[in-house]
From Swiss-Prot:
Phosphoenolpyruvate binds at residues 51-52. It catalyses: phosphoenolpyruvate + UDP-N-acetyl-alpha-D-glucosamine = UDP-N-acetyl-3-O-(1-carboxyvinyl)-alpha-D-glucosamine + phosphate. It comes from the Bacteria. GO terms for biological process: cell division; cell wall organization; peptidoglycan biosynthetic process; regulation of cell shape; UDP-N-acetylgalactosamine biosynthetic process. It is an enzyme of class 2 (transferase). One of its GO terms (molecular function) is UDP-N-acetylglucosamine 1-carboxyvinyltransferase activity. This is UDP-N-acetylglucosamine 1-carboxyvinyltransferase.
């Protein structure tokens, strides 16, 4: 049986459940953003912790009975949903701003129900930790998703190679194992969440596990660093071959989540498109090399500090060709934002999407703003125009919504971006951060609309 799970933006699906946890859910399902374009951006923006690192790291808290202390955790809807899911299992958590303390000593319900999994595909990441520590896990299959999918088969195949008995019935993956055994696992494709799930499971397995064709994303590396801090034995971190020596137990640890390279890239792209001079703080340039290279090609000046990135842009950008691929190549999660940049650039450029089969849904909305984009299969030809014009547009997924915000910053007149609950899944207070550097962006709550 083949089932599917989104790999890179593991949580792009529509949220319908009310997130729990101590963090306040500040977004309403019908909120909109009103953007008055044409302003240069200037000032500083603090980059939040990485969503795609925080979610597996929160799930890794299940691997130990001792407290795991996390810093730089972003305040996002998906983080709150993950904490709600872990809380249902018996995990206790304390949250103070960007600091979260997890205590899994009393976890007694190793089940991830459909009600939460359908809102967030990253919920599959509890499968490996639950099975490794408790010998049992029951996790709902992820539901439908807007932008295409990748198979969860790789997770199941890898766990079966480690000795797990897995049955899929009534929409649930039910997995059992007295203790997982080390194995050599070769994934059919590069899978981020699959690598993370198998890596977490292998830390408590009996013997050596080798994961070949492992994902190399910085978020996978960040998870591995937390696991090592908890007592795991992992070699090959940052490469496509991970070697894990299983241990009897993992202990507590303290860890800071890496900066969000996609949030940083989105703001860099916004400045390159709209013009300005902005410094990003709390950012590591080396995890964003492919994006920085393309922005320089577009004409932006980017200065790299120890933990800062300064971007300066005058005039129109130059069109740049993009081809998405696995890290360290150009990330699929930045494709839509560069589409918006190319929409106002001088010249024309091709954008080719190789990761997802259905990730051009923002094209129709960008064209509503006056962009000139033609799609042919997995390639889009973007011919830049001097100016976009404000209009009402609708977000279809997380990164598409970011591209519409960037386009709105460049457009003449007002742009109204609807369904921004997508944006809130992956960006911590985007409108607040943009307003602080001179953008005219305001949230219209559902009650006002």
């Amino acid at each position: 049986m083949q089932v599917t799970v989104n790999e890179h933006d593991a949580v792009e699906c529509v949220a319908t459940a009310t997130p729990a946890g101590n963090r306040e859910a500040h977004a309403h399902g019908t909120d909109k953003l009103a953007i008055e374009g044409g302003r240069r951006l200037a000032g500083e923006i603090a980059v939040s912790g990485a969503k795609n690192a925080a979610l597996p790291i929160l799930c890794a808290g299940l691997l130990s009975a001792e407290p795991v202390r996390l810093d730089n955790v972003p305040d996002l809807k998906d983080v709150r949903t993950t904490l709600a899911l872990l809380g249902q299992m018996g995990m206790r958590e304390e949250t103070d701003g960007a600091r979260v303390v997890l205590d899994a000593s009393r976890v007694d319900n190793p089940v991830a129900p459909y009600e939460l999994v359908k809102t967030m595909r990253a919920s599959i990441l509890v499968l490996g930790p639950l099975l490794a520590r408790f010998g049992y896990a029951k996790v709902s299959l992820p539901g439908g998703c807007a932008i295409g999918a990748r198979p969860v088969d790789q997770h199941i195949k890898g766990l079966q190679a480690m000795g797990a008995e897995i049955h899929i019935e009534h929409g649930y993956i039910e997995a059992r194992a007295k203790r997982l055994s080390g194995a050599r696992i070769v994934t059919d494709m590069i899978t981020v969440t699959g690598t993370e799930n198998l890596l977490m499971a292998a830390t408590l397995a009996d013997g050596e596990t080798v994961i070949e064709n492992a994902a190399r994303e910085p978020e996978v590396t960040d998870l591995a660093h937390l696991l090592v801090a908890m007592g795991a034995k992992i070699d090959g971190i940052g490469t496509d071959r991970l070697v894990i020596q299983g241990v009897e137990r993992l202990h507590g640890a303290t860890h800071a989540v890496i900066p969000d390279r996609i949030e940083a890239g989105t703001f860099l792209c916004a400045v390159a498109a709209a013009g300005g001079d902005v410094t990003l703080t709390g950012m590591r340039a080396h995890i964003l090399d492919a994006v920085i290279d393309k922005l320089r090609e577009a004409g932006a000046t980017i200065d790299e500090g120890v933990d800062t990135l300064r971007v300066r842009m005058d005039g129109r950008p130059s069109a740049v060709a993009i081809r998405t691929s696995e890290y360290p190549a150009f990330p699929t999660d930045m494709q839509a934002q560069f589409m918006a940049l190319n929409a106002v650039a001088q010249g024309a450029a091709q954008v080719t999407e190789t990761i997802f089969e259905n990730r051009f849904m923002h094209v129709q909305e960008l064209n509503r703003l006056g962009a000139n984009i033609a799609v042919d299969g997995n390639t889009a030809l973007v011919t830049g125009v001097p100016k976009l014009s404000g209009a009402s547009v609708m977000a279809t997924d997380l990164r598409a919504s970011a591209s519409l915000v960037i386009a709105g910053l460049c457009a003449q007149g007002e742009t109204l971006v609807e369904r921004i609950y997508h944006l809130d899944r992956g960006y911590d207070r985007m409108e607040t951060k943009l307003t602080a550097v001179g953008a005219n962006v305001r949230r219209i709550s559902g009650s006002e609309a």
